[in-house]
Every structure is written in C-alpha cells, then in structure tokens.
Swiss-Prot record:
Encoding gene, per UniProt annotation: leuD
Record note on quaternary structure: Heterodimer of LeuC and LeuD.
This protein's UniProt keywords: Amino-acid biosynthesis, Branched-chain amino acid biosynthesis, Leucine biosynthesis, Lyase
GO BP term, example: L-leucine biosynthetic process
Gene source species: Acidithiobacillus ferrooxidans (strain ATCC 23270 / DSM 14882 / CIP 104768 / NCIMB 8455)
Task of the protein: Catalyzes the isomerization between 2-isopropylmalate and 3-isopropylmalate, via the formation of 2-isopropylmaleate.
Name of the protein in question: 3-isopropylmalate dehydratase small subunit
Amino acid sequence: MEAFTVVEAVVAPLDRPNVDTDAIIPKQFLKTIERKGLGKHLFDAWRYLERDGKQVNNPDFVLNQPAYAGAQILLARENFGCGSSREHAPWALADYGFRAVIAPSFADIFANNCVQNGILLVRLPMDVVDHLFHEVAANPGYRLRIDLPAQEVQTMGDSRYAFPMDAGHKHKLMHGLDDIQLTLQRDNAIRVYEARRRQTAPWLFRD
C-alpha cells in the first residue's frame, strides 16, 4: 500500500450530499475480488450515458471534464460513503487515482475501509467545505496541498485548515500499512509468545 505523506493535486468537486457506496461503485461490478480494474466503473451511473445501445461519457459529469483530468483529491459533501459496507467503494476510488477525499463527514464503515486501502479522509467544517467548492468552481483545475504529518490542508491562496486524525490511522497511512502488515511488524513478539504458550499449554498446538 502506498504511503501518504504530502499530496498536492487537482481537486475534483462532487457537489452532492449523502453519496452512497452504490453510487460510488454499482452492485453489478461487485463480483470481482480484485482491487484493480474498478476505477473505470467509479460513479458509473453518473459518469456514463447510454446512446444507441452504447455507453458514452456524460460530458456534464466532473470526472469527464478536462479541467479535472488527473485529479487525486475528491471534494465531497456530508455523509459521503453511506449505505452498504462494500470495500469495492474505496477500491474503485483508489484505482481511479484518488489519494484523498475531503468532506464534512463520512460513514463509519466506509471510513475504516478507506484507511485499509490507503485513502486519506479529511474532515473539514461545513463552512470551509463550502468555501472550497466556491474556489474550485471559480478556478477549474484548482489544486490543494494535503500535509498528513502536519494534519493540514493548504490552498492556492495559502489559507491553511487543520483537520483531526486518529493517531492509529495516521500511522497506518503514513507508513502504507494495513492491519495485516501492522501485525507482521510484531512478528518476533508473536513468535516468542507462541513458543511460551507451547510450553505452558501444549494441548493447544498440533504438530
């Protein structure tokens, strides 16, 4: 998993509240257990149109507009990621290329899944998010700098906004660790514990 320290990138605005995981990645794409390849289906129902039996880009959708090509930061509204707990949602966001999502609030399960997949969720107050939407609308191709070690978002005008972050989640993201990799960092301690347990409770082990 790629570590997250500082990212400066184009911001794509998605000005809709309560975007659920079915909107992020529709159910027909959930058959795969591969994390790669889902980016092309991100926001599928909004991103594409059906014309003459063919799927074509919706020119009105933000991800199809040239100003937001290569965006790595998604600006969203409150309760982003609500709905079912499908992990395919952060898989699709990550595969598209998003490193961070900024919003006033996120659904809890979605938020945890994002941490496990290296996506930083930045919670900012509603008035700050409103201001950022205004700035992005006025300046297509608008960029933000997100500094995770400092827990700070910096704008093109040099305004700075601090954001809260769970210490454990911050450690995982900064070092590119999921739960399994975090556990493996304690491999020696686990082996010592298992050896001790083998001596004190041998019936628990089958050689």
